[in-house]
């Protein structure tokens, strides 16, 4: 069984979760327990060290890895600045690069993301860039020092599933780096599909947070990710366009 190692840390639970859109900060601790997630993303604006009641960190156990994102950045320079602030605030050296200047579809800017990744990786950050799935951009992100890459399945927050499935599959097949499917996954079955494809992990936020029961939805996603990974490692049987009986069709009545 392959291990998932990012930044020298073994990640045993391949479901990453986000921290936005929940009805309250207090529920996040229960979602983390239900999902078993070791990694949680958070926007820096939700960290308030001067007001513990509003500070999201008060609801995240100390053994969970913080993955601050650069939400709000529209270019590489802004993303770099946000990342440095996050580390200075004590959020660690993991960073999810988000560079988005498109306000309609919220698609990440791969070129600016590559620039930010290079600078931050050189500064010792563990960089996980959010990106539009593209093989060439993935290769350049690896060259820039990315620890993993996070291609979107569909526009962020859309719950539409794996609309970019074929492009993600190419990246999984061709890149020697963890591929974490991020954005657009709306159902546990879609997370399972991503894992069956060979994705290293999935990051899910909106599908859990917007459900009627986020805690049980987190549990459902945990099982789906585990099942999908197990199926991938078990090497699924080949598809056939013809029927293939599982029992002999001749000889019984002879």
Swiss-Prot record:
Per the UniProt entry, the Enzyme Commission number(s) are 2.8.1.10
A Gene Ontology biological process noted in the UniProt record is: thiamine diphosphate biosynthetic process
Q: Which Pfam families does the UniProt entry name for this protein?
A: ThiG
The record's annotation in InterPro entries points to: Aldolase_TIM, Thiazole_synthase_ThiG, ThiG
Q: Which residues bind 1-deoxy-D-xylulose 5-phosphate?
A: 157, 183-184, 205-206
Q: Which residues form the active site?
A: 96
Chemical reaction(s) catalysed: [ThiS sulfur-carrier protein]-C-terminal-Gly-aminoethanethioate + 2-iminoacetate + 1-deoxy-D-xylulose 5-phosphate = [ThiS sulfur-carrier protein]-C-terminal Gly-Gly + 2-[(2R,5Z)-2-carboxy-4-methylthiazol-5(2H)-ylidene]ethyl phosphate + 2 H2O + H(+)
Q: Which keywords label this protein?
A: Cytoplasm, Schiff base, Thiamine biosynthesis, Transferase
First-tier enzyme category under EC: transferase
Pathway this chain belongs to? Cofactor biosynthesis; thiamine diphosphate biosynthesis
Give the highest taxon in the source lineage: Bacteria
Q: What is its main location?
A: cytoplasm
Q: Please tell me one Gene Ontology term that the record gives under cellular component.
A: cytoplasm
Q: Which residues form the signal peptide?
A: none
Q: Where is the protein situated, by its record's location annotation?
A: Cytoplasm
Molecular function per GO: thiazole synthase activity
Quaternary organization = Homotetramer. Forms heterodimers with either ThiH or ThiS.
Purpose: Catalyzes the rearrangement of 1-deoxy-D-xylulose 5-phosphate (DXP) to produce the thiazole phosphate moiety of thiamine. Sulfur is provided by the thiocarboxylate moiety of the carrier protein ThiS. In vitro, sulfur can be provided by H(2)S.
Stated family:
Belongs to the ThiG family.
Recorded protein name is Thiazole synthase
Recorded source organism is Clostridium perfringens (strain SM101 / Type A)
């Amino acid at each position: 069984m392959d291990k998932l190692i990012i930044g020298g840390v073994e990640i045993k639970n391949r479901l990453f979760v986000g921290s936005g859109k929940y009805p309250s900060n207090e529920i996040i601790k229960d979602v983390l327990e239900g999902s078993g997630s070791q990694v949680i993303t958070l926007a820096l604006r939700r960290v308030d060290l001067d007001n513990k009641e509003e500070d999201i960190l008060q609801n995240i156990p100390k053994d969970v890895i913080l993955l601050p994102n650069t939400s709000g950045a529209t270019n590489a320079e802004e993303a770099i600045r946000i990342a440095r602030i996050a580390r200075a605030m004590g959020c660690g050296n993991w960073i999810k690069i988000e560079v988005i200047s498109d306000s309609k579809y919220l698609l990440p800017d791969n070129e600016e993301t590559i620039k930010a990744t290079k600078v931050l990786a050189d500064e010792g950050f563990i960089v996980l860039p959010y990106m539009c799935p593209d093989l060439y951009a993935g290769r350049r992100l690896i060259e820039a020092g990315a620890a993993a890459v996070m291609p979107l399945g569909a526009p962020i927050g859309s719950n539409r599933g794996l609309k970019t499935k074929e492009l993600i599959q190419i990246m999984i097949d061709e890149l020697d780096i963890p591929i974490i499917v991020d954005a657009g996954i709306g159902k546990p079955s879609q997370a399972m599909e991503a894992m069956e494809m060979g994705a290293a992990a999935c990051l899910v936020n909106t599908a859990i947070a917007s459900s009627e029961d986020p805690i049980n939805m987190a549990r459902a996603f945990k099982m789906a990710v585990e099942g999908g990974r197990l199926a991938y490692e078990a090497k699924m049987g080949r598809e056939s366009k013809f029927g293939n009986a599982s029992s002999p069709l001749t000889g019984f009545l002879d």
